[in-house]
Swiss-Prot record:
This is Elongation factor 2. It comes from Candida glabrata (strain ATCC 2001 / BCRC 20586 / JCM 3761 / NBRC 0622 / NRRL Y-65 / CBS 138) (Yeast). It is found in: Cytoplasm. Residues 17-346 form the tr-type G domain. SUPFAM superfamilies: EF-G C-terminal domain-like, P-loop containing nucleoside triphosphate hydrolases, Ribosomal protein S5 domain 2-like, Translation proteins. Keywords: Cytoplasm, Elongation factor, GTP-binding, Hydrolase, Nucleotide-binding, Protein biosynthesis. Gene3D superfamilies: 3.30.230.10, 3.30.70.240, Elongation Factor G (Translational Gtpase), domain 3, P-loop containing nucleotide triphosphate hydrolases, Translation factors.
Length: 842
């Protein structure tokens, strides 16, 4: 066992070329935590007997009970590679010991914000795919996120034991199934890849794909088999690797290689992969599982596997585990693949810097990040907060991109809204301690150089969720993470005992710190609202809130859905509003924006912080906007980055710039709470046509302009055929054929519409994809399991906003009922006000 000390690891941290930061990502239940176990065991942290069952990285009690990962956990491992392997690494390295910082992330779709946080601080990803189920919706989502952050993937095809023992497939079928999976991963990679990253497709013949079983603790790459055979037959290893995959066949009679499936007499030949790689594995499985006592010793001798005396008495699965572990230890295959094919921080930061850093690409900090320079000014990105054993305190978990972080060092803590040169969202504080994250434990260290992943103590009070730490006064922030899911399910939380209210408020603060994608807010009527990405996510958050963060009994309302307000047409007449003192007037019209523009804003392709000329160019070329309009976008709303715009179409108005700030803040206010049901607006574009202002500055202050602009926005909105939008989940359901009927009946009952249904070749499984309104999704999983006898497993992820056709202003329609219910809940008058209420006559 390699029991290593913290000092050894600290000295490795300085050799940045020998560090690998990687995360493990996959679809739910494809076996990430189980696979991670065999790596952890190799590093001597859990015993070999437990690996595969311990799920060491699932540190929380509810994770062990539910058998799912909820939070991403980090651990540092130490590994030695043999000399001849080190020579073949395609990048610089120093010595043959390597430090691997590994983050195990959740696969469940509700927690994909945890995955985003894990990806930000790593450079490579191990994508785990189930042999039987193949590439699923969540595999695609996480892979897309990874490529968006310019992270290089390697693949491990897991659960091969299932294919051998449960499905009893033939060798050729198994090869075809592997090659289909690799093919579909490569399709995703080529769809979302980016030029800077280059070609990152995975090829078994190059050693970037491993095959194995996390539960049994064995895995192999083609490179390992090629090494064995190269020694045995005295041939070149590289040539052997290429021949062990794809259409190459070996004719044992003539001892010749060919790429035809038959020999000269027309007899079928066996594929090299099947013959040299799968055959020994299949033989072992057959001999052991059919209890052929006499064959086993000869096989083991051929494969050079020595059993201890007590292991010789085992039989069946127990013996299989021991033998396969000795024959093809999982950790060796995976560590070799990680070290050889994933980039070191030096290599990766070179091409990731411009995407991580908000400032210009030629400033000193960006260059330091590119070089991963430990002597430069500190640049550290905190991607999430990890709760400590000490109640209410958090470790800041992040990665040093440049410089060195030391305990006791004074640093600048820059929150997400910090702008260089200003004092907003900035704190100057000292780091108390620097620690190494080791699963559920932490180890203190003195300092940590660039390129490593680290935990910090003592700065949690100054950061909400994420932020940039630096010692340079001119540093811009690191770019904010984009989450692929949005919080669309909310509940109102209240205390059972009124004395506990302060505890609840404190608990909500802590909750929003500990989860990157939960929203907590207080509504106008005084309710405390918690919003999550789905039912499961919300359930875990509330359980944490009740037991950990607040520690008091709570009353929880039934879940409700967040809607959006939008318009269908241009305002039927110009909306006019006068200021309270009757001296200023604003004339405007509202109109809908294209869905693709709204999506581009939500995904950050059109960014309020970009240069307005460059942004106008993009909007004109890609979305067909008029260039002068695109240049005159005053602001995005709500929160300064939402999918609603104010466009200035006025001509020659005096004093216009003086009221710009008031108009902008009024628009943020109006779009945050629309006139119909007090929800956020979406895809609304407001064109200001004309403004009449009083000549005296004192009569056109914010107090005069803000209410006017808000009323005008509401009037224009209500004149433009208002509609409401509801969030829609994309549901992917895997099930056997006989259960498909049950799925359709449940979906029809819940206003779902089926998008596609296909059978996975080589398995009895069907995949059904459907759209399901979030409003109908509560209890969907339970009903589905009932209708299909527990054979169907749904995965739901937020997909898009769908406009409801009925009129929200008519209280008898479907939309009208939603509006009435929401207005009651928000404590507003039940009647929706008409546009006349906000419109002023000349």
């Amino acid at each position: 066992m390699v029991a290593f000390t913290v000092d050894q690891m600290r000295s490795l941290m300085d050799k940045v070329t020998n560090v690998r930061n990687m995360s493990v990502i996959a679809h739910v239940d494809h076996g990430k935590s189980t696979l991670t176990d065999s790596l952890v065991q190799k590093a001597g942290i859990i015993s070999a007997a437990k690996a595969g069952e311990a799920r060491f990285m699932d540190t929380r009690k509810d994770e062990q009970e539910r058998g799912i990962t909820i939070k991403s956990t980090a651990i540092s491992l130490y590994s030695d590679l043999p000399e001849e392997d080190v020579k073949e690494i395609p990048q610089k390295s120093d010595g043959n010991s390597f430090l691997i910082n590994l983050i195990d992330s959740p696969g469940h779709v509700d927690f994909s914000s945890e995955v985003t946080a894990a990806l930000r601080v790593t450079d490579g990803a191990l994508v785990v795919v189930d042999t039987v189920e193949g590439v699923c919706v969540q595999t695609e989502t996480v892979l897309r996120q990874a490529l968006g952050e310019r992270i290089k993937p390697v693949v491990c095809i897991n659960k091969v034991d299932r294919a051998l023992l449960e499905l009893q497939v033939s060798k050729e079928d198994l090869y075809q199934s592997f090659s289909r999976t690799v093919e579909s991963v490569n399709v995703i990679i080529s769809t979302y890849s980016d030029e800077v990253l280059g070609d990152v497709q995975v090829y078994p013949s190059k050693g970037t794909v491993a095959f194995g079983s996390g539960l049994h603790g064995w895995a192999f790459t083609i490179r390992q088999f090629a090494t064995r055979y190269a020694k045995k037959f005295g041939v070149d290893k590289q040539k052997m690797m290429e021949r062990l995959w794809g259409d190459s066949f070996f004719n044992p009679k003539t001892k010749k290689w060919t790429n035809k499936e038959t020999d000269t007499d027309g007899k079928p030949l066996e594929r090299a992969f099947n013959m040299f790689v799968l055959d020994p594995i299949f033989r072992l499985f057959a001999a052991i599982m059919n209890f052929k006592k006499d064959e086993i010793p000869t096989l083991l001798e051929k494969l050079e596997i020595n059993l201890k005396s007590d292991e010789k008495d085992l039989e069946g699965k127990a013996l299989l585990k021991v033998v396969m572990r000795k024959f093809l230890p999982a950790a060796d295959a995976l560590l070799e693949m990680i070290v050889m094919h994933l980039p070191s921080p030096v290599t990766a930061q070179n091409y990731r810097a411009e995407q991580l850093y908000e400032g210009p690409a030629d400033d000193a900090n960006c260059i330091a990040i590119k070089k991963c320079d430990p002597t430069a000014d500190l640049m550290l990105y905190v991607s999430k907060m990890v709760p400590t054993s000490d109640k209410g305190r958090f470790y800041a978990f992040g990665r040093v991109f440049a410089g060195t972080v030391k305990s006791g060092q004074k640093i600048r803590i820059q929150g997400p809204n910090y702008v260089p040169g200003k004092k907003d969202d900035l704190f100057l504080k000292a780091v108390q301690r620097v620690v190494l994250m080791m699963g559920s434990r932490v180890e203190p260290i003195d300092d940590c150089p660039a390129g490593n992943i680290v935990g910090l103590v003592g700065i949690d009070q100054f950061l909400l969720k994420t932020g940039t730490l630096t010692t340079s006064e001119t540093a811009y922030n690191m770019k904010v993470m984009k989450f692929s899911v949005s919080p669309v399910v909310q509940v109102a939380v209240d205390v059972k005992n009124a004395n506990d209210l302060p505890k609840l408020v404190e608990g909500l603060k802590r909750l929003s710190k500990s989860d990157p994608c939960v929203l907590t807010q207080m509504s106008e009527s005084g309710e405390h609202i918690v919003a999550g990405t789905g039912e499961l996510h919300l359930e875990i958050c509330l359980q944490d809130l009740e037991n950990e963060h607040a520690g008091i009994p709570l009353k929880i309302s039934p879940p409700v859905v967040a809607y959006r307000e939008t318009v269908e047409a241009e305002s039927s007449q110009v909306a006019l509003s006068k200021s309270p003192n009757k001296h200023n007037r604003i004339y405007l019209k509202a109109e809908p924006m294209d869905e693709e523009v709204s999506l581009a804003i939500e995904q950050g392709k059109i960014n309020p912080r970009d240069d307005f000329k460059a942004r106008a160019r993009v909007m004109a070329d890609e979305y067909g906007w008029d260039v002068t309009d695109a240049r005159k976008i005053w602001c995005f709303g709500p929160d300064g980055n939402g999918p609603n715009l104010v466009v200035d179409q006025t001509k020659a108005v005096q004093y216009l710039n003086e009221i710009k700030d008031s108009v902008v803040s009024a628009f943020q206010w109006a779009t945050k709470e629309g006139p119909i049901l007090g929800e956020t607006m979406r895809s609304v574009r407001v064109n200001i046509l004309d403004v009449t202002l009083h000549a005296d500055a004192i009569h056109r202050g914010a107090g005069q302009i803000m209410p006017t602009m808000r009323r005008a926005t509401y009037a224009g909105f209500l004149l433009a055929e208002p509609k409401i939008q509801e969030p829609v989940f994309l549901v992917e359901i895997q099930c056997p054929e006989q259960a498909v009927g049950g799925i359709y009946s449940v979906l029809n009952k819940k206003r779902g519409q089926v998008v596609s249904e296909e059978q996975r070749p080589g398995t009895p499984l069907f995949t059904v994809k459907a759209y399901l309104p979030v409003n109908e999704s509560f209890g969907f999983t339970g009903e589905l399991r009932q209708a299909t006898g527990g054979q169907a497993f749904p995965q739901m992820v937020f997909d898009h906003w769908a406009t409801l056709n009925s009129d929200p202003l008519d209280p008898t329609s479907k939309a009208g009922e939603i509006v009435t219910a929401a207005r009651k809940r928000h404590g507003m008058k039940e009647e929706v006000p008409g546009w006349q209420e906000y419109y002023d006559k000349l």
